Amino acid sequence: MKALTTRQQEVYDLIRDHISSTGMPPTRAEIAMRLGFRSPNAAEEHLKALARKGVIEIISGASRGIRLLMEDEEGLPLIGRVAAGEPLLAQQHIEGHYKVDPSLFKPSADFLLRVNGMSMRDIGILDGDLLAVHKTQDVRNGQVVVARIEDEVTVKRLKKHGNVVELLPENSEFQPIVVDLRQQNFTIEGLAVGVIRNGDWV
């Protein structure tokens, strides 16, 4: 990898920090505003230079189409906020990679998901925890799953009967989510296989 100029390093650091804080890369306009460029075109030129040096990949056709290549991508990807209608493991959802041995979990974990909310509190899955997830659609009733209903991603206990799925919380303050498979888009994204208390590991 070629050495970066001071300005290129500033652009790279901004992209990395923006992904870390928001879960997605910045737009060209945001880069220009933050670093005092005259226009988004100036930001684009710096991005092209970074791409030539092999530290980022520019994904055409997307305003936030920037992927970091210099990051240490060993370990499990951590998924933060998930944008509506986009794949769970889309690059812009990945906050970082953490050196957690996937084989610590059975079955082995494929990614970590940052938990949002307290609906699974009573089985020890708390707001802000990192949920280890095995990517599969082969799940059974009674298992805790990561599911997508329409454009919402949730962690719940699965109960399926016929064309109806109930997603059960583990907290009496929350109501079950009932899904009619004939009328709603429903996908199993994975099986919960463990929890890392945020701050204890990463």
Swiss-Prot record:
SUPFAM superfamilies hit by this protein: LexA/Signal peptidase, Winged helix' DNA-binding domain
Keyword annotations of the record: Autocatalytic cleavage, DNA damage, DNA repair, DNA replication, DNA-binding, Hydrolase, Repressor, SOS response, Transcription, Transcription regulation
DNA-binding region: 28-48
Site (Cleavage): 84-85
EC number: 3.4.21.88
GO biological process, one term: proteolysis
Recorded GO MF terms: DNA binding; serine-type endopeptidase activity
The keyword Phosphoprotein belongs to this UniProt entry's keyword annotation: no
Keyword DNA repair carried by entry: yes
Enzyme class, UniProt record, top EC level: hydrolase
Active site per the UniProt annotation: 119, 156
Catalytic activity: Hydrolysis of Ala-|-Gly bond in repressor LexA
Family in the record: Belongs to the peptidase S24 family.
Subunit structure: Homodimer.
Purpose of the protein: Represses a number of genes involved in the response to DNA damage (SOS response), including recA and lexA. Binds to the 16 bp palindromic sequence 5'-CTGTATATATATACAG-3'. In the presence of single-stranded DNA, RecA interacts with LexA causing an autocatalytic cleavage which disrupts the DNA-binding part of LexA, leading to derepression of the SOS regulon and eventually DNA repair.
PANTHER family on file: LEXA REPRESSOR, LEXA REPRESSOR-RELATED
Protein's name according to its UniProt entry: LexA repressor
Annotated source species: Serratia proteamaculans (strain 568)
